[in-house]
């Protein structure tokens, strides 16, 4: 009889020998309900029902006993059910520790969790934790597993809640971080003795080592056999080990003072984020600091879902830096790469040249070439990298070679076109190569006197199966060819049928290639008949067409074309098109076949030719200059869809260049496919070396059926090698590399996929990584070991030896020459100084002039000053002020030559009449403009106040030998005039815009990556997406121009001595050409003028035009003007009305929210304090956390904190430091390098206060005082108009500086406008950029309205195209202010209005071209009162 479940339980208790330990009730009432057995997993699960909870001690004894009894048979678990759960809450507290042990938490965290307070309420268990972070972590990490553990023990629990005690949060935060991340001490005790010994020895070694950690090792060593690929991590796991290379690392300090590190690694199967908190009393931070991008690490930890980034991450317990075996070039004799593409190959190459050069050097290659597509923009960086790594750099380019004009007529015949007989024919073939493919259909029609008089149509049997591609293209099937005659029979019959007629074909070179090859194989020799190519003929006589395919031409000529790509139909269509073309030629005066090429040739013939790739290698310095000329001509003169190099251009500048055959797109490779060997060898003689590239790179040609198979490809290689051997030309193996390693190829795929029109999208991209010598030898093993070594190693090294050392970048500055520049600058400086200070110059003036002139003239900089002076003078003469930028205002010579308005001398008075002066040299006055008003004691005239106290050293350095960088702010509307004036000064061929290179930005790359993954149906975690984004970032995307930079070439050199030239973004309609090199590359070699466009001078000019006030006469210390920087009272409004505590809305430099807050904090009242504000706002770590705190705590006031870089030198010299040391300190601090021990000691010796030293140590970047002073001077002048001439100011502001308008709000009353502004403030964080720009305009409008002025609606009768105009106390906005209305339409409205009034909305749409949407907006604005939808017809109009 079967045992009951109670009996089973008793048997079990006896078997595991605990019967005597159990309570009698439990022993008698307990039930063993079932046992779940898994033989596969060797697990037994006992299901036991008890009448009550076992005492915790008994429970542990039971579990231990049952595990021991069956340990050799299975892994045992128990699942209890308790029928009477009385006192469940008490038992839960006792069982808590055991249940925690069943979770996946680390032992250390388990220990901490066991100390938490437990509260049981019904079926809910509450665990009291210290803070929100702890609560979130425990809830996520163990909630489910903890509930399961309690239920397995018999507890009836629905959920567990982790609750925080708010009072404990702050004090326990640091403890929490440790709990989550620290190593488990208990686990360490259970480790093997050997491991303990290793750790002890390592600890001892670290204790004895006082130097910084140079290799990361945290936690336990990780067993390599546990490593798994990152791509296999797809869900949360307790313990995982991985290896990867770091591609991003971020170390963040927490409020507790500890740090968290976030590392992104990849093993190139996938990527993962690793995280870890530093442990207390450990040197983890130093270990993390030893890590950097590019290092390999082995890491171990828990995989969990990060709720913030919503992705899997590893919370590390262990990490160690490892040495990963890198790719080696093990060949004894290394090769040289002659074909390589960098990130400058537009949207095609991946790494920068520096990465290639470093890798080549690491492999021991003696040299390396760079051959980007159509450009040489990598040359400067290539030179620097080669010098750094000690490797020979070979400079080159892969260009597009075209014949100067593809002929229309071949083998000219003396035949009158109207009398000739033509055979218009077409062939269908098994492929594109007449050498390796066969004709399957030959069709022709015979034409005479404009009519088709005969037809010829034959199939031929190729004796091979047609590919699916050919069947789909031609609609010819194998069945149609089975019984077809041999091609020999077809061609023999065809030749006889043709007679002496002129051949006509569309793309005749293709069709005639097959005919001539067939004739020659039959022993006929090539055809002697004349030929006309209708494709080239159309390109010449139909230049207005963008396409010239047969389909397109058939439509244009009205010819029916059915079943395109069947020979007979194509032939008939071509015949009818050609008949019409003959008439066109007659109208152009072309009457004879032998006149076609002569009379129809044109200068744009290069556009018609099909480009072939060609490699150009620089052999010497002359070759470099010639290459620069070729590149320039291809980009400027011969650009058509892509830069083109006419063969005649290459021939003209071939000296110093080695010409190679390039890739499968090269002329020679094409010839092997299309011509017999004698023709191939003839073409080969044009080149200096023949390239053959790895078969792997040509696999796509086989896939696309352009090459039949690998055997055919090998035959092509043999023919290329034979051509080289026959012509005595070296054959070299080149890699055509587009990236460094195989795993980088994905980035190129992504970039190519982002270009829908790129032909490379048609096929699978081959592996184009940078190959080692061994890899290249292996690629060409089919040639035999000796021949492979010859082309891979021997020939590449010999070719490299023929190339001289070439330097692409000059090593010194070449400035223009201007006769008498030294004398003119000296005379001009002294003349203006005497005009201002009198004939008897003060000694301080003489000393400063002489000091500066000695440096300026002695170092050859006078010409730079003179150029700047003439540019500024021209602008001033034309009525536009010029603002200076940068440190030029530090130069008193620049002031005296009127380059800048900033006077850098110490603050001083000057009498305009008797020239008496008084200088303040003790630092007591920050700016001369802040001196109190004073009259001359001699003559009683009001004294002029000047001087900003700026040392000259901040401009040209302490020795005065730094090349001056004079940046000038011209009016934006005058800037083109200033640019063009440089052509007057130097000549059109001596000035160019400074070129820039636009690369793929991170945000753009992210779009490319996401698009590619979506298209491919691939899901990747965020870390892998980040890696792919980094791979695509930095690749050249376009070119551009510096907004104001003009490069000046000296008259004794030409531009090609420095750089090629081009149009920005290849825009052939651009008014200026730019440098081909990024201007930074040649910054130290040629003079760069920064002629920038700025709104301030434009606004000043408009204010001057409106008011008639000369801006130079505006007082800089006007009290009401100064007041607006701390209160809006002088504007006649309150803070509440304009919602701002200052009156600086719209004042340059002081109108942004950030600077307005600075003004509220500091309440400046003087010009020097405004200069301080400008310096503080532009610096990095100068205000926030630095000067701001010093002012708030009362340690300093605004005038004494460090604001501009020059303040440091001036302050320290006044404190007693030597000028040279003061200068060194200033330079160190402004560059964010802090202070050396020597500097600190010197400053303390001169009693510089500690707060000053601390402030210096925090600064990362500082603004020049001269720049700040120039900005503030403009700002104060504009503010003057705002205070004293409001409508002039508002009209100018809205016209010049504003761009986004909400006119519907702007025409409302002041209360409505204020409410709108207030509402937008409340939603500020949710506003987009455009809305924020609108808000800026509405802030100004609100202020204007509360000052008693208002905005009218747009007026069809009065509004201008672009300018706000004043009418009474109102402004009338221009048409351009209407959202969505462009410049051209704005002008068109005004022009149409001048022709007469608009009669209706329909009339407005018709005359001005306004869209319905714009008309509706104007209607809503109230700008179209009484204007009907349509004009009413009057009797007088009839």
From Swiss-Prot:
One of its GO terms (biological process) is DNA-templated DNA replication. It is an enzyme of class 2 (transferase). Its EC number is 2.7.7.7. GO terms for cellular component: cytoplasm. Keywords: Cytoplasm, DNA replication, DNA-directed DNA polymerase, Exonuclease, Hydrolase, Nuclease, Nucleotidyltransferase, Transferase. It comes from the Bacteria. Coiled coil: none annotated. One of its GO terms (molecular function) is 3'-5' exonuclease activity. Its main location: cytoplasm. HAMAP family: DNApol_PolC (MF_00356). Required for replicative DNA synthesis. This DNA polymerase also exhibits 3' to 5' exonuclease activity. This is DNA polymerase III PolC-type.
